[in-house]
């Protein structure tokens, strides 16, 4: 009898996959969202703390410029730390593994939680600034490693849904920070150190529970060359014993890029066979951050006030906007495998483009037409919905899908660097743009949304329900690499003698 091919099955959601996803996302992605929003509500109390601490040391209060500068540094240290964390992704995931990196990353959450929690007792605002760098590093690592880890755990028919879960927990983190940051809870003179210090709790829980779950089978098989460990991991993840078909698929990926070996960031940019993949992640990550999402939130309070919302009630409306963000991200989990990644990106950026255009007109005319502030509120909510559907969750998922194992860590380093530098740039530049252009500042974001939509329409293929090899073959045709067999797509860059080995 001829040997039969291994039986391929549709993957399913097992308790192991669900729990590993929830623990990784809560322990890591949640903190990213929490620390994005946690210093917004208590900012005035924290500035007072900075001032009183300075007075206790030198006998006089800070001038307005120095206080503003110190606060700007405090805020900007988070994206700066995120940038540093992105640079650490490649070395850590290659040496410690995906799960190992997430466990190591908890250091960058627990230590700053203690620093921020005890900063008031220690009378040191420097502890807060250092802590913001450290939680930024935590966010920079988690925003790249969690999607990579979950993407490599998931069966292909669930990869999209699980790939959106990290973004869901980011939005939940933002919402929880907004709720805890209500003035009646922790955004007050006594409560703000507790509000900042709570970020360490998810890290402690992840440190306790994640060790009981499998490492990425792809990492174990391709990089550690441990087939038995990979089989054990797959059996736990899939819930059945016969995993030979999936092992063979992973080995096929390994053979397809064996000659490539370790791919650095520099090598990533030089490889012709990865040209459109690299350009795509740069465009998507830059488009995600430069599309105006942070500016919308920055402007939201002013828009709510202009519509007649009382100043004390703005915090509740802001939390309501955060709840909408969570709800739509939950919807994205259920529709990403039905509608596909490409459709959600096109829909999301198109909604953001339309919202920015209408918001520009509404802000320009709100002093002339009485009901225009309500149009502005509708635009803010529409923008949040559009961004939560595609631009927020999908780019990180696509980085996992359009790169193979050897190039994935370097790709995440590039994606993370673009993400955090773009985030930092918007935070630094937007206040000046807003002063100079006023309502018309959103025209810039509308243009970026439009250009990103055009790029997605022309270049980005649909990746749902495809294996990593199948997706890579699509890009091989786009990159027009001559004479490369579909299973040797990344070998064009190497001498023939090497490729034949």
From Swiss-Prot:
The modification N-acetylmethionine is found at residue 1. Belongs to the major facilitator superfamily. Sugar transporter (TC 2.A.1.1) family. Glucose transporter subfamily. InterPro entries: Fru_transpt_5, GLUT, MFS_dom, MFS_sugar_transport-like, MFS_trans_sf, Sugar/inositol_transpt, Sugar_transporter_CS. Glycans are attached at residue 51. Pfam families: Sugar_tr. GO terms for molecular function: D-glucose transmembrane transporter activity; fructose transmembrane transporter activity. It is found in: Apical cell membrane; Cell membrane; Cell membrane, Sarcolemma. Residues 1-18, 92-98, 150-161, 214-277, 335-342, 395-412, 461-501 are cytoplasmic. The chain crosses the membrane at residues 19-39, 69-91, 99-119, 127-149, 162-182, 193-213, 278-298, 314-334, 343-363, 372-394, 413-433, 440-460. This is Solute carrier family 2, facilitated glucose transporter member 5. Functions as a fructose transporter that has only low activity with other monosaccharides. Can mediate the uptake of deoxyglucose, but with low efficiency. Essential for fructose uptake in the small intestine. Plays a role in the regulation of salt uptake and blood pressure in response to dietary fructose. Required for the development of high blood pressure in response to high dietary fructose intake. Residues 40-68, 120-126, 183-192, 299-313, 364-371, 434-439 are extracellular.
